[in-house]
Amino acid sequence: MGSIGMTELLLIFGIIVLLFGAKKLPEIGRGLGEGIRSFKSAISGEEKKEDEKVVTPKEIEAEVIKKEKVKENA
């Protein structure tokens, strides 16, 4: 109970064909695929942003001081 069997899937597919027609099915599938693809890329984009290192102001200040000391010694 609760799982969808092969007969239920065929029935759902038949209803979709009746509602939209056979000519519209490739367009619907293409649109659905593009939507899923863009959703996945948006999610992976957020993960990439989280992986990037966050630089704090203290780290920036320390780097500037380090460069100034190098200039003074040169």
Curated annotation (Swiss-Prot):
Q: Does the keyword Transport apply?
A: yes
User: Which terms in the GO cellular component ontology are assigned?
Assistant: TAT protein transport complex
Q: In the UniProt record, does the keyword Lipid metabolism occur?
A: no
Compartments where located: Cell inner membrane
Q: How does it assemble?
A: Forms a complex with TatC.
What is the role of this chain? Part of the twin-arginine translocation (Tat) system that transports large folded proteins containing a characteristic twin-arginine motif in their signal peptide across membranes. TatA could form the protein-conducting channel of the Tat system.
Q: What is this protein called in UniProt?
A: Sec-independent protein translocase protein TatA
